[in-house]
Amino acid sequence: MARKRKPPSSQGDPRRYDPDFQGPTAKRTCTDVLCCLIFLLFILGYVLLGLLAWAHGDPRKMAYPTDSQGHFCGQKGTPNENKTVLFYFNIFRCTSPSMMLRLQCSTTQICVSRCPERFLTYLDMQFLNKEDKNYWEYYRQFCKAKAKPVETLRDLLISGDCPLAVYPSRPFLQRCIPDLSALNGTWTPGSRMKFEDGSGQTRTMLEFREAANGISDLINARTIGLKLLEDYATSWKWILIGLTVAMALSWTFLILLRFTAGFLFWFFIFGVLGIIGYGIWYCFLEYSSIQQRPQSTFWMYGFGIQRRVNMFFHLKETWFSMMIILSAIEIIIIIVLIFLRTRIQVAIILLQEGSKAISYLPSALIYPVLTFILLSICISYWAVTAVFLATSGVPIFKVMVPAGQCIYEDETCDPEIFPYTNIPKDCPGASCNFAFYGGRSMYHNYILTFQVYNLFAFLWLINFVIALGQCALAGAFASYYWAMKKPDDIPPYPLFTAFGRAVRYHTGSLAFGSLILASVQMFKVIVEYLDRRLKKAQNSAAQFLHCCLQCCFWCLEKMVKFLNRNAYIMIALYGKNFCESTRDAFYLLMRNILKVTVTDEVTYFVLLLGKVLVSGIVGVLAFLLFTERLQIIVDGPTTLNYYWVPFLTLVFGSYMIAHGFFSVYSMCVETIFICFLEDLERNEGSPSRPYFVTPALMNILLEQGKIKKQ
């Protein structure tokens, strides 16, 4: 009888014993060449896009305010060099609903050297000017350059050369904002409660505040940006010191893991629980303190987010909410520890094995610096290109009508010939104002497409840099594992060799994997963009769909990242293309699914606690410093607008630094584990086919009952 063939397994066939296999394959060929060529062409196109944006863009358009003629205020070498402030002819038009759509007030705007200091209408100026000519000299500085005195208000409305009235204002981010002074709780300009705006209409303080808020909403982001820059300029030395402390702590923890993994594991746990407990205690103190004050709950309103942020930390609800959130995190960590208590010993042994590998390959701890440099280059290039693309083009002028009832509204116009057209006659009050920077050329028509290209290229390059690091580290740690006599059998310069192999042979495969991940992330960005566009509609079905898509893409991204990491390990080991490596890694994990659940969950959780502990220690020190509670340091920053800005920067920066160091550790543990699974399938522990795994790791897994001898 013929012998029946065994059907192929749905989980793939186990590895067979190969006496010649001694770690990462030396003889390789280039993989995924087509994807490599596409990737290189894509980078070339990205470079050309950057040069094109550099040639057409002008970042000054974001730094200087622009008048209605499209000229910069305060720019050196121009007639507006000494006119650094933007003045609005009719600030009440900034309350128009269409203003937020155009991001521009539908009123004439000119550059002036100073803001008005008194309330004065044009008619009052005419009357007073008969006795004192200085009134016209004062008023004309808020008019157009060619303005001349007119006799009637009708002539003034037709010419549009001067505002109907000027109000006491103060410069705010190079804009003249009405000076609203609080007198006995009532908002008043100067000392008037109601007044005429020069056109016969009576205005109230509420209208004034709405107009000021309208302008504030337009420039709010730039306001916060400047204040943030000021805070960074004040505290940058302390931020660098804090990041250095985070780097030293991360390095110290990695070294200590080699000798005291068990002790450090419990130190991570109790350290994180202690820091969160301190946060709960501090939030409770602030909550109790504010609760004893009268009027601790109030409605927040004012000029943009600056006022709201300042009030935010004076609300008892703020501290109560943060206390609840921290308490929930504390409880979740304790529950997770209870469920994972039986697997902690496995994680400790894996951490010790990872520490041994890193001690033999100390250059692995320096590799995050290279990753940081490459990521910084990618982020900087993306940001600069985005700014230059956003500021490309020439000034575009459009017809703006305050009433919004004109057939010519939003049509392009030329400010030089606009007064001689029929538009001012057909639409009284219409003006030809600067709207935005753009153009009608092919380049300007594709600005949005270029921005999308810029974002996708950024995501692709970021993921490629991370993939390159993972593949290089995997190759180095695989060389360590498959050395029978450590460190004698470890090849020289394993990290440098693995990095060279990855770049020379597997650029296409790494680009392929990073392309898949970048595509998923791009879809997430598109979903978020659509959600922001649909939020105002308050459509329940659309919101439900968004939540479902967001959840699906989040799960998909996590799954792709997990498969990519293991695929890069297989690429580093065998040098196959991305699809074959992904298939082999997936089958290997599926054949050993129980062992995967033992290691990954606990090990990653321990490393996460280490990152949180590093950022938490630096965060507590930063909080004490920036709130002047650290009495040891007397020269700390004391003039910060928002102390939480450098504080959050330090916490986030410390976490990213710790993530950079601990990601090396994570890749080390994952590579050792994949190699361990390969080792179990290739060998049997006999003298002729010995295991490469260390006895400590083998014994702990045997004790857990996860490995059964063949």
UniProtKB/Swiss-Prot annotation:
Topological region Cytoplasmic: 1-32, 258-260, 341-345, 390-454, 531-604, 665-710
Transmembrane segments: 33-53, 237-257, 261-281, 320-340, 346-366, 369-389, 455-475, 510-530, 605-625, 644-664
InterPro entries: Choline_transptr-like
GO cellular component, one term: plasma membrane
Swiss-Prot/TrEMBL catalytic activity: choline(out) + n H(+)(in) = choline(in) + n H(+)(out)
One Pfam family of this chain: Choline_transpo
GO function term, MF aspect, one: antiporter activity
Annotated glycosylation sites: 82, 184
Region ranges (Disordered): 1-21
Biological processes per GO annotation: choline transport
Main localization, broad class: membrane
Lineage: superkingdom: Eukaryota
Recorded topology in the membrane: Multi-pass membrane protein
Function: Choline/H+ antiporter.
Name of the protein this chain belongs to: Choline transporter-like protein 5
Organism for this UniProt entry: Mus musculus (Mouse)
Organismal lineage: Eukaryota, Metazoa, Chordata, Craniata, Vertebrata
